[in-house]
Amino acid sequence: MIRPVGAVVLGIGVMIALCAGVGMVWDQFAPDPSRPQGGAAELALSAIIVSTVGLIAFLYGNRFVSERISRREALLAVSLIWIAAGACGAIPFILGAGMSVDDAFFESVSGLTTTGATVIADIEGRLSRPLLLWRSLIQWLGGMGIVVLFVAVFPNLGAGGKHLFRGEVPGTTAEGLRPRIAETSFALWKLYGAFTIIEIALLKILGLDLFDAVCHAFTTMSTGGFSTLDSSVGGFDSAAVEYVIATFMLIGTVNYGLYYGLLRTGNWRS
């Protein structure tokens, strides 16, 4: 039960490092003087802290409990994963934006659960682009479910992975999507990613810069609603952009199991 939590925490550390690297490259080759500069170093430090904790839990967690996960343990593991993810996701806000622990945890949990509430009053003046990218990414990860991603990346859990998947995605759709849960998880994430890429392309065509297009596609597909602007999507002053974002928000509200069944068999009821 500890090992799955460690794996997800390790994965979050890798994602933070990715945001640090991408954000640093963005600032280097396409600087935006209107936004706070830097932030990559703070995210890199956050990534080191989170990855170290996750690696230790992943490598040594199975020494304290049975490696095989029962259904009851999986439900507890899913709960622990979300709590740990919220705590780890808050570290970049603490180090990169100087937020208090409670505000940072609120922002992180709001993002991961795609709630969309925020405690940041001055987004454009307070958050650097690496941190804005992280803030958008946590909504995208939470939109499909970090546990579903974990099961796809670590397919060797066997029955434990199946119980984790059902703990994250309960109901008849989770029971009958596909015999191999890891393949199902990977297929759902591929579909989710494809919709995201299409939206990024459309927003870029409509005139958004690549950074804003990526961030808003992340928060649109998850139906979370975080923005890189204080005035949100209205700041772009474009009806076409609003229609595209509204369309993909509607797409994001549909159960992805239905999309999967339609693509696989041509039948919604499958």
Please tell me what each predicted stretch does.
Residues M1-S270:
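Membrane-proximal intracellular helices of multi-pass ion channels
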